[in-house]
Design a protein with these regions (language model features):
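N-terminally biased helix-coil "hinge/interface" segments that flank
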Residues: 1-171
């Protein structure tokens, strides 16, 4: 767009109404299964996700922080399609639905950047090598959560400064 346009261009959306897909299941606030996840619903969701042509999926089901079995079942089915799947019950297992959903969407979006880098690093290294990334808590882990990895750079900087200071003191 021209630099002085009067019509704002907007930002790319991580989530659109068309990409929010329902699945028929229900878990109560106490974690009990009220409406089981049936295979027909699972197959329908797989087909809808495949038609969207996305690279990653965020799964956020009500009360999954108490009982994640439905999220885990959906993840297993969607991972078979070659997609990165972020589960709210793993990313941020708390009762607050908006925060849990937001963090899970960001995790899935971040995966489209971080997972290919991790795969490329592994492909370039000798067989049996591991890639570890510093997460927001300062711990280096392999198979990290993409969202925690994005916030890990500050923690990694502090850890590196601490290590350099320790090396300097040894001299």
């Amino acid at each position: 767009a021209p630099p002085y346009t009067l019509v704002p261009t907007g930002r790319p959306q991580l989530l659109t109404p068309q990409s929010c897909l329902p699945v028929f299941e229900r878990i109560a606030a106490d974690g009990s299964i009220v409406e089981p996840l049936i295979d027909e619903a699972l197959q329908s969701l797989r087909a809808q996700v495949q038609a969207l042509g996305v690279k990653s999926v965020a799964i956020t089901l009500l009360h999954s922080y108490r009982e994640p079995v439905h999220e885990q079942t959906l993840a297993a089915a969607l991972t078979e399609l070659g997609l990165w799947v972020s589960l709210s019950s793993e990313v941020l297992p708390i009762p607050r639905e908006f925060e849990r959903a937001s963090a899970t969407v960001l995790d899935a979006a971040a995966a489209t950047c971080t997972v290919p880098i991790e795969k490329a690093l592994l492909a370039a290294l000798p067989a049996g090598s591991r890639v570890r990334a510093v997460q927001s808590d300062g711990v280096a882990r392999s198979g990290t959560r993409p969202l925690r990895t994005l916030f890990g750079s500050q923690a990694a900087t502090l850890l590196a400064a601490q290590r350099v200071a320790a090396l300097h003191e040894q001299r």
